[in-house]
C-alpha cells in the first residue's frame, strides 16, 4: 500500500515538481541533510510561515529536560536528555521591493526540489508571484563531508517581469525552541555576536541546569560572497545577526557557515577557530568546497552501494536509506552514537537506543572500516561506570545500560521501558560478539569487551530468581522487544539473551590474561552460579504447538491475526487505548523472531518455520525495526513473496511514510533493515563461527542485484542474477568461505549456479 509518496522514482535522486502545503513537514524530513557532525531539516532558506518544523541539530549537543510524569516512581531519571534545536544558520531572507517572499503566502507557479544522493546536495527552485511581479528562486546547499563544520549555500533570485529591487538577508538566528520541550522553555542564552559588511557570528550557550550535566556553547560564523549589489548593511539584535544586500532585478549569493562547539574547542577559541576554517573555505571558493564534498560521497558509495536491476522503486529506497545512515554516522567520533531520528527531528530525544547494537552494527561492519563500528562499541565501554550506577539505582549488581542516553545515565522516564526493557543489556553484549566474530579483533576483548561482559553478566545473575516450584531460573517483570506488552514474566527473548550473555562471558574469560582476570575480580564461586543459571534457565515452550512462547501467558490471550483487524484502526497506537493494546496479542515488532534472527545457527529450519508461521501473522509491524527481521527470516524460509513484501516496507518506510509519522523525522536506525534484508536475507550472508557464508537467491521481480562488503581487510563484490552468483575479490588476500554450504576458496573471481527452484 502506498501511503504518502511525495517524490518521483529515480535511482539516485528524490525529486518532485509538486509542493503540497499539507505535507511541508514530511518534505522537510525527507530532504534533511547531515554530515555526522550536524544536520538540518529540509527547511526553505527564505523561511515559511505555514506549518513547518525548523530544525538544526549539532551532534553531542543536548540538554537535560526535567522529567514530567504524573506519578513519580523511585528510580526514575530526573531528566530526559534531548538533542536540542540549535540556531538556524541556513536562513536567507528574500524581499522584492521591500516585501518578504513566503512560499506559504505567495502563489507558486513552479516548484522543484531535488536531493541528489550520489553527491549529497539539495537543490530547489521555485517561481512565485508577489504583487504584479514574478520571481524565480534557486538554491543549492550541502553540509560538507570534507570540512565537517561547514554548511555552504548558493542562493539566487531574479525578477522575471521587469525591474525590481531584490534584497537578500543571510542571517544567523538563535531564537529557536524545541517542540518537545516538557515545560516550553528556551534552552539557549546568548554569549556573543558581531557583524560587519560581509560576515557575522553568533554564539549561544545552553542555559544552566540543576542536574550537573555539561553545558554547551555553539558558535556559527558566516561569510557571504556576492557582487553586483547596490546597497549593503548589517545589524545585530538579541540572538540574531544579519547581513543585507540589495540588487537590481537579479541577485546571487554564496553563504558559507562554520559551526564550532565547546565539545571540540575551548570557549575562548570558538570564534578564532571558526574564522580560521572560514577563511580557508572562502579562499578556495564554493566550487572547490563542493568538489571535495562530492568526492567523499563518491568514496563512500564505492564501498557500500547496493545495485538492484529491475526495480527502480526499491533501488531508490535502499540508496536513500544508505545515504541517510552515512549522513548521520560514519564513525568519526567515539563520543557519538546513532539516534533513532538522527538529525531529522526531535522525537526520542536524539539519544542512543539499543537499535544501534542490534541493527546498525552488522551493517556498518560490512560497509565501512572496522574503526567505524569499534567507535560504536567504545561509546558503550566509556559509559560502563554510568551503567553500573543505573543498576545500583534499581538495587541491582553489575551494569544495566540505559534505554536512552547521552552520557550513560538513563534518560527514559516511562517505567515499563526504563525499569523493564532490560533485554537492551544483551544487545550491547551481542554487538561485542558480532564485532570480534566479524573482524577477528581479539584484542578488543582483552582491552574493553570483557569489562562490559562481566558487568552485564553480574546484572543478569542478580536479576534472575530461582523458582523452586519449577526448579528453573526465571526473569519476571520485563518488557520484551514487543513493546505492546509490558510487565510480563519470562519473556522468551529476554531469557535467551540473558543466558547467552552469561555463556559468552564464560567463554571469553578463558581467553583473557590472568592479570585482566584478577583486575575483574572474578571468582570461581561466581562463575559456578552463572553456569547454574545457564543450565537451568526457563524458556516458555508449547509442546502442543511446538513453538517458543513469547512469555508465560501469551497463549492465554484472545489470539487473532492481523488480517482480522479493520484497516481504519491501524496503526493501533494512534487508534486504540493503551489498555486495549496491552490486552491484545498483536505484536509491534519481532520478539521471539528477534532471538531466532540473532542466534540463527542454533535453531533448525523447522523451528524457524513453525515460529515464523505462528508469530508473523500476529505482527502489525508498527515499529520501524520490525519488517527487516521478518524479511530476513522469510527469505531464509524461501517465502519469497512475503520476504519481498516486507523488504518493500523496510526499504521505503520513510519515502512512502508507511507508519504515518515521518513528518516527525526519519527512522534512521531502522533504515539499516533495508541493507540487512538484502545481504542477510536475499543473499543469505552469515558469519557464524568466524566463517563467511552465502546462500543467495534472486527475487523473481528483479533482474539482478549486487553489493560490496568489507570483511577482514578484504573488499568483496557479490552479484546475483537468475542463474548464478558471482563473487569477486576486489581487494585483499584469498578467503576460505562457504557458498550454499559448500567450501570455496575465493581468489580473484568465483562463480556458482543458483539452485533451481
From Swiss-Prot:
Disulfide bonds: none annotated. It is an enzyme of class 2 (transferase). The keyword Transferase applies. It catalyses: D-maltose + phosphate = beta-D-glucose 1-phosphate + D-glucose. Coiled coil: none annotated. Substrate binds at residues 354-355, 588-589. The active site is at 483 (proton donor). Keywords: Carbohydrate metabolism, Glycosyltransferase, Transferase. Its EC number is 2.4.1.8. SUPFAM superfamilies: Galactose mutarotase-like (SSF74650), Six-hairpin glycosidases (SSF48208). Pathway: Glycan degradation; maltose degradation. Gene3D superfamilies: 1.50.10.10, Glycoside hydrolase, family 65, N-terminal domain, Maltose phosphorylase, domain 3. GO terms for molecular function: carbohydrate binding; hydrolase activity, hydrolyzing O-glycosyl compounds; maltose phosphorylase activity. GO terms for biological process: carbohydrate metabolic process; maltose catabolic process. PANTHER family: GLYCOSYL HYDROLASE-RELATED (PTHR11051), MALTOSE PHOSPHORYLASE (PTHR11051:SF14). Belongs to the glycosyl hydrolase 65 family. NCBIfam families: PRK13807.1. Catalyzes the phosphorolysis of maltose, leading to the formation of glucose and glucose 1-P. This is Maltose phosphorylase. It comes from Bacillus subtilis (strain 168).
